[in-house]
Amino acid sequence: DVENEMHPEWPIPLPGVMSAILVSMDDKYLYLNNWLHGDMRQYDITDPHKPVLTGQVFLGGLLGKAPKVNGVEVAGGPQMFQLSLDGKRLYVTTSLFSTWDNQFYPEIREKGGVMIQIDCDPVNGGMKVNPNFMVNFGQEPNGPSRCHEARYPGGDCTSDIWL
């Protein structure tokens, strides 16, 4: 369960909004995004009846818990994501749907979206933002632009192009 959290600008507790989930190729980990809160989570689902939170990082979001990445304050929250076939790299984008982006994250109009790499430990669990990787779509020549979904050349955990 993702608990609602209090927010000073909301009259009700801020709900968690998950728009995607992904299971690693070895069926050990489940990943989910929490678009409004701003976090990505990794759960060990070896026992699917008792998932264990093994990793959590914040990227943007409305709770103000996210650090800057490469000196950039992330606009939006974690939305679509792709996991490498070896389970070591999770690529996360920050635009859900432009109408919703504009409502909840109006700063994304000027800043644009980003794609961030999260380094994952596929053996012991755990996640950390890679401080050396960011694609800043706000700096595009005709931008600022937003990024919704990325595909991994050669295959990822949610497509069958690697077969």
Predicted segments, located by residue:
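Surface-exposed loop and turn segments in beta-propeller and other repeat-based domains
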Residues: 1-13, 54-73, 130-163
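Structural signal for beta-propeller blades
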Residues: 38-40, 99-100, 115
